[in-house]
Amino acid sequence: MTRAERKRQHINHALSIGQKRETGLDDITFVHVSLPDLALEQVDISTKIGELSSSSPIFINAMTGGGGKLTYEINKSLARAASQAGIPLAVGSQMSALKDPSERLSYEIVRKENPNGLIFANLGSEATAAQAKEAVEMIGANALQIHLNVIQEIVMPEGDRSFSGALKRIEQICSRVSVPVIVKEVGFGMSKASAGKLYEAGAAAVDIGGYGGTNFSKIENLRRQRQISFFNSWGISTAASLAEIRSEFPASTMIASGGLQDALDVAKAIALGASCTGMAGHFLKALTDSGEEGLLEEIQLILEELKLIMTVLGARTIADLQKAPLVIKGETHHWLTERGVNTSSYSVR
């Protein structure tokens, strides 16, 4: 099977499997504010991702590319919607285009359709610094995502089986590319120990890619004759990943992704410490179900509803929202307690 065929399978399986509410964000409840002393028109949702400034705290996270006409059309529509909404956009892994120049167009279309927007390049941790530079140049990227997908590779029938040297390669990439490097998980979450190693290696931000969104173990298992089903429930939830990393690295930049589906999810993720939030599966479904116009409407709706939530919480800025008091309960509370995180630090701030 070619890489392009595999990418098309990934898209179809991602849409058929969908997402479940297993992000841990349902364990998070905001403390109501009866006197917010704020007007909706005062709310400012601009944010920073490391040194990058963005007018939006949500972006279209990495999905696809290198799968021929199908992924070309998807990326074209995503780029148009991102441009019109004024939000950043990440492309899927560009390794296919580095290995097969005929696939470059499915990535280059993103910059063509969105000449002035924030665009993130994307490669796996097997990439070299030279490949990283080429990926950035290919689409005139403002940042580079390096994705960590160990579980996906292990379950993938033709996937990698060696993950040695990944941190060293990431460190080399961080020191040699001219744009900020974001290291991201792909739906299995991230621990504070892993995040610490990545910050030390030079990552400008980590995208925690929490459990509860698109499940690449399930996707790859659908492609196997004999399934490795125990990996389908493997990972750290989005909420738990955010809270435990923030407890250890309060001044470092985190991005939240992994099953976010609406403005309340976005608000909770930011209150748990994220500077920005990425959505992939939710936006892909919106595009598939309702077309480009429907996707744009969904993005705009989430941004408007986020402003409403910030208004009732009295949070004028994203920095204010990051300090909004909240209560953590259930399985997320249990996980964090066992991991040595004092959850009351969120409720009494």
Swiss-Prot record:
What are its GO cellular component terms?
cytoplasm
Q: What is its EC number?
A: 5.3.3.2
- Give the catalytic activity: isopentenyl diphosphate = dimethylallyl diphosphate
Q: Give binding positions for Mg(2+).
A: E153
Could you list the residue ranges forming a coiled coil in this record? none
Binding-site list for FMN: A62, M63, T64, S93, N122, K184, T214, G258, G259, A280, G281
Required co-factor?
Answer: FMN; NADPH; Mg(2+)
For this protein, what is any one GO molecular function term? NADPH binding
SUPFAM superfamilies (alphabetical): FMN-linked oxidoreductases
What keywords would UniProt list here? Answer: Cytoplasm, Flavoprotein, FMN, Isomerase, Isoprene biosynthesis, Magnesium, Metal-binding, NADP
Compartment(s) where it occurs, according to its Swiss-Prot or TrEMBL record:
Cytoplasm
Annotated positions binding substrate: R6, K7, Q152
Which CDD domains does this UniProt record tie to the protein?
IDI-2_FMN
Primary localization: cytoplasm
- EC class: isomerase
Report the Pfam families cross-referenced here: FMN_dh
Q: How does it assemble?
A: Homooctamer. Dimer of tetramers.
Instruction: Tell me which PANTHER family the record gives.
Output: ISOPENTENYL-DIPHOSPHATE DELTA-ISOMERASE
Q: What does this protein do?
A: Involved in the biosynthesis of isoprenoids. Catalyzes the 1,3-allylic rearrangement of the homoallylic substrate isopentenyl (IPP) to its allylic isomer, dimethylallyl diphosphate (DMAPP).
Similarity section: Belongs to the IPP isomerase type 2 family.
| Name the UniProt record assigns to this protein | Isopentenyl-diphosphate delta-isomerase
GN (gene name): fni
